[in-house]
Amino acid sequence: MQSAPASAQGIPVAYNDTVVRQFAIMTIIWGIVGMAVGVFIAAELIWPTLNFDLPWLSYGRLRPLHTNAVIFAFGGCALFASSYYIVQRTCHVRLISDKLAAFTFWGWQLVILLAAITLPLGITQGKEYAELEWPIDLLIAVIWVVYAFVFFGTLAIRKVRHIYVANWFFAAYIITIAVLHIMNNLAIPVSLTKSYVIYSGVVDAMVEWWYGHNAVGFFLTAAFLGMMYYFVPKQAGRPIYSYRLSVVHFWALISIYMWAGPHHLHYTTLPDWAQSLGMVFSVILLAPSWGGMINGIMTLSGAWYKLRTDPILKFLIVSLSFYGMSTFEGPMMSIKTVNALSHNTDWTIGHVHSGALGW
């Protein structure tokens, strides 16, 4: 379906909703697949013989498939769909190129299929959330550059002067993920299916968790905040509670989040000052995170009655509640004394799942 509302000048605009719908459908499909794999490997922890002594069904190979499917297939398709949907409606223009938008869709599905083939076969870099080997990494980089061109190109031809705050969050996520992906995956290929990362030892660990933490921070947080800042006011039929707070939320989040990665490496050979730095910035993150949560929830001021009848608003408010809970739990678990108790326990797994599924 091609939407045709009026632009700022009153001229009808035919939005490209085809690619949005395609990504939305694949979001559902990959969500089912990713969570089904998660249920299967959880069952393997109880009944190990479920792997039937087949290496490609072993927990060690399917766990990366589960995380990649949920984060990059399920979450990624949701973000492509929502960013394309929102940027058109807040800029009052059609996507700058339908063909390039279609390329990002088919290219991203190819990446997902290649991941689904290579990970169970054990073709991996062995880096969490960055397991895919160098040919797939290159393909991701190409797709991401095209995605950035489509998004920023659409912003450049907008019919309204103002850039809505949701687009700031999407822009930050697109730029940051590009930097993280390229820097963390710098490697020397030795064959089509094998490469060696250029970093070693504790430097490799630091770069990996700079990437790993901020993949969560920008892919699963900043980008979904962009979604929140559009759909919560839209569904509530009210302006965002405090637009000024949303701008402060944006700049505080992107300034602080990048420094918090070392909290994944407490009590390791990472220098103690780096661990402490990560802890401090993680604790500071509580302020902008809760500011954003409060901003979203307070947008319903004067419209709380809609929660009784609007199922979409119910989901949005519950997701904001989970966001608040997870962003309290994360800074708390980054404190070294707390981390000494929580590290390598199911609490960490619960924290990740409450954030990913709840938010």
Which functions belong to the PLM regions below?
Residues 339-348:
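Flexible, glycine/threonine-enriched loop-and-boundary segments that flank and lead into catalytic domains
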Residues 1-24, 49-57, 196-204, 341:
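Extramembrane terminal tails and long inter-domain/linker segments of multi-pass membrane proteins
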Residues 128-132:
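Segments that form or flank anion-binding pockets
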Residues 4-16, 148-163, 294:
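Cytoplasmic juxtamembrane interface segments
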Residues 16, 61-63, 305-308, 347:
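Helix-boundary and loop/linker segments of multi-pass membrane transporters
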